[in-house]
Amino acid sequence: MHELSYATSVLNAILDAIKQQETLGRKVIKVTDINLEIGDLTLLSVDQLQFVFEVISEDTVCNGAELKAEMVKPKIFCMDCEFEGNLDTKDELEVRCPKCESVNVKLKGGKEFNIVNATIEFDDEE
């Protein structure tokens, strides 16, 4: 279950960002949601990622934060016919160009795992 390491990375990144804000004198109340961009080729289960995040963030300001994920389709570039576009992911190990059937292709995406943004509530009242 590699979802645990990904969820831990997200939590640590958000907590680091919160520490930076706190050094600027801002008081964080809570994190309400976190938006992710996840490539299909990471083979992550979003449901498992959300569950694990819920468990590990329990005693933090991220407790209750909604983890949202936008899945990113893999893209390929064919070295033979120069086709560039989305790759239809099937249960096959061999990747072929959908235009010419060549296996001489380069992956150009689909392995992403990015934090797009997070909504953080601050207590800025003095």
From Swiss-Prot:
Binding, Ni(2+): H2
Keyword annotations: Metal-binding, Nickel, Zinc
Family matches, as InterPro entries: HypA/HybF (IPR000688)
GO biological process: protein maturation; protein modification process
Gene3D superfamilies, A to Z: 3.30.2320.80
Disulphide bridges: none
Entry superkingdom: Archaea
Chain residues that bind Zn(2+): C78, C81, C97, C100
Alphabetical list of Pfam families matching this protein: HypA
GO molecular function (one): nickel cation binding
Function field: Involved in the maturation of [NiFe] hydrogenases. Required for nickel insertion into the metal center of the hydrogenase.
Family per similarity comment: Belongs to the HypA/HybF family.
Name by which UniProt lists this protein: Hydrogenase maturation factor HypA
Gene that encodes the chain: hypA
